[in-house]
Amino acid sequence: MTELTRRNTMKLMSAALVAGVSFSSLPRKAFSAGTITVLNWQGYGTDEAWSVKAFTEKTGIAVVHDYYSSESEMLTKLRTNPGAYDLVVLNAARCAQAVAEDLLQPIDFSKVPNAATVDENLRSNPNFSKDGKGFAVPWVWGMTSLAIREGMPVPDSYAVLADPAYKGRVAMDDDAIINVAVGALMSGQDINDPKDLAAVTAALKSIKPNVKLLWSTEDQWNKSFAAKEFDLSLFWSGGSVRSKRNSKLPVQFVVPKEGGIGWVDGLGIPASAPNAEGALAFANWMIDPAFYVEWATKVGAPASSNSAALSALPTDDLSRQVHKPEYLKTMGIMSALPDDRREAFNNVWQEVKAFYAE
């Protein structure tokens, strides 16, 4: 998950407590006891009190947490505190970097039985693997794509952003990386490494007559959509669920033929983890369908990597309707960007924004 998206997600998740949770797939005391230390964003799934309590009661394994406030801080903690952590939550883009620095150990998937139904499109992502070995259990995912007002024609391409029919009715996410990815898809290029930035720039500039708003927060998006300032927008999959469920807005999330711009968070075991066995048990717990249904319906959660978990949601659940497994086949997953490429992307977006303002 991007840092901005994750922060907004966690702010909007409630602190609901669910009693009496039962996870039948994990037998009592099935794994070695002890304590595991989890490194994660605060309030992001692994530290739900009801879940930790149920896990400890089933396994005898206590769970403590340490938190980071940025992905760079997460990597620094792994580098400078060997032996301090047993499980780390990290984005696919950062996982590749951690593997390159030998900060993670290979996952023994035989000890994560719930991973058998993790979507292969996620499990085989090159950011999570090296030399045929997996270094993280894919956990949750989401994407940026198109959101439209219900009742309007459903678009099949990002080219709709430049359609004259939407003159003055489009909202764009004020994020350089996302917009360059959109421009790359509009010009038939790779979202992480578009070779022709001039074509990306031209594609984004073609949207100018339609751009009504550059939004930066979910709250701003909701208020502007409710005020009917726009009808078509780039938006987050999870945001569209919350807007429809919590704010009762008539929004429909659409993934065009070019695919969504995706992120995936995984569960990794640090190379120096003192209790890897316990960490694997907890990773298995985190992708358990029973845990996920409780987290998603009682608290609010991104899409599970486990297709069995998504399928366990009620058929009318908005998250299940938005995060369809078939979207993973075309979803491009954002990778870590070298500094020079990130700077180039920022320069493209600054040029485009200046053009919009003329």
Where in the sequence are the language-model features?
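N-terminal secretory signal peptides and thylakoid transit peptides that target proteins
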Residues: 1-20
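Early extracytoplasmic/lumenal segment of secretory-pathway proteins
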Residues: 33-98
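Extracytoplasmic ligand-binding site segments that recognize negatively charged/polar headgroups
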Residues: 45-48, 89-226
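A ligand-binding cleft/hinge motif common to bilobed small-molecule-binding domains
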Residues: 94-97, 226, 232-249
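A bilobed periplasmic-binding-protein/Venus flytrap-type ligand-binding module shared by bacterial periplasmic
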Residues: 145-152, 184-186, 263-276, 283, ...
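Periplasmic-binding protein-like
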Residues: 201-207, 247-271
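Mature extracytoplasmic/periplasmic domains
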Residues: 270-330
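Conserved C-terminal helix/tail region of periplasmic/extracytoplasmic solute-binding proteins
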Residues: 325-358
